UniProtKB/Swiss-Prot annotation:
GO BP annotation list: immune response-regulating signaling pathway
Protein name in UniProt: Venom metalloproteinase inhibitor DM43
Assembly information from the UniProt record: Homodimer.
Entry's Gene Ontology cellular component terms: plasma membrane
Phylogenetic classification of the source organism: Eukaryota, Metazoa, Chordata, Craniata, Vertebrata
Annotated source species: Didelphis marsupialis (Southern opossum)
Length: 291
């Protein structure tokens, strides 16, 4: 299983959605119950260190003024006495329209039979309504109000999508700037994998050479099929599964001169259509002079 990312999310809680900058609290959310204290950073400098209460570190900003506008991040001290990575930056502007959300696709900006395509629209303020827009439509194609600062939309058609967030109906004039546009397509290929030699050194006949092929999906785990290629042709070889289903090892045992050549790998979704990734980067194995 994948290890949980310890990076905390940083959210903005407002007491009044209709006037979101009049009374603001920053919430730094812990990922487990053993975290001790947290730090708030503003514009790259440490601002404050405070205790975590429950799973949330709270830092009250109050009314947003010229003195406290800026880019905020947070991090948390764990029971192992290690600091987590800093959170993604959150901009406190005190102005409207509100800062644009981010929009990303999982597993990617594609429509593939058998796979669910999700668009994640992530803002910064809690208690907002998220709207998903498709180019050519005047009104949102989907809307969602969630307790967090992110909404997830499932899409089934190609097109150009963007999103924004807004205050609830009681304050309809408070909106964010739209996100960047994502182009959702039916792909010819999937993105190429990372490909490298695990025991990278000079090789001699009789050695074991282990290649690693890794598909770069960060949101979740998928059931993937991997293949190894030598000089552009599929090569039957032992596939070594590991705990991470997004990666495999290919073992070449007792290699000889015939195993020299240019290697690459590909992957595809087992439950999806027969669309493979582009060829990975190429690694050349030369058993006479070393790799």
């Amino acid at each position: 299983l994948k290890a949980m990312d310890p990076t905390p999310p940083l959210w903005i809680k407002t007491e009044s959605p209709s006037t979101p900058w009049t009374n603001v609290t920053l919430l730094c959310v812990a990922t487990n119950t053993e975290e001790l204290s947290f730090q708030v950073w503003k514009d790259g400098e440490l601002l404050s260190t405070l205790p975590v209460v429950g799973l949330v570190g709270k830092f009250w900003l109050g009314p947003v003024t010229a003195d406290n506008r800026g880019i905020y991040r947070c991090r948390i001290l764990t029971s192992e006495n290690d600091w987590t990575p800093l959170s993604a930056p959150v901009e406190v502007t005190g102005k409207e329209p509100l800062p644009a959300p981010s929009l990303h696709a999982e597993p990617g900006p594609w429509i593939l039979p058998g796979l669910e395509t999700k668009l994640h629209c992530r803002g910064m303020l809690l208690g907002m309504i998220f709207d998903l827009y498709q180019e050519g439509e005047q009104e949102p194609v989907k809307s969602s109000q969630t307790p967090s600062a992110e909404a997830t939309f499932i899409v089934n058609s190609t097109g150009n999508y963007s999103c924004l967030y807004r205050a609830p109906a009681s304050a309809p004039s408070v909106n964010s700037t739209p996100s960047e546009t994502i182009h959702v397509v039916i792909p010819d290929f999937l993105p190429k994998a990372n490909f490298y030699i695990l025991n990278d050194r000079d090789f001699r006949p009789g050695d074991i050479v282990t290649f690693s092929c890794w598909a770069r999906f960060s949101e979740r785990e998928y059931d993937l099929e991997f293949k190894l290629f030598k000089d552009g042709q599929e090569t039957p070889v032992e596939v070594v599964p590991i705990s991470d289903p997004m990666k495999v090892f290919f073992d070449l045992t007792a290699v000889g001169p015939k195993d020299g050549g240019k290697y690459s790998c590909r992957y595809r979704f087992r439950n999806g259509p027969p669309i493979w990734s582009e060829d990975s980067n190429v690694l050349e194995l030369d058993l006479s002079t070393g790799q």
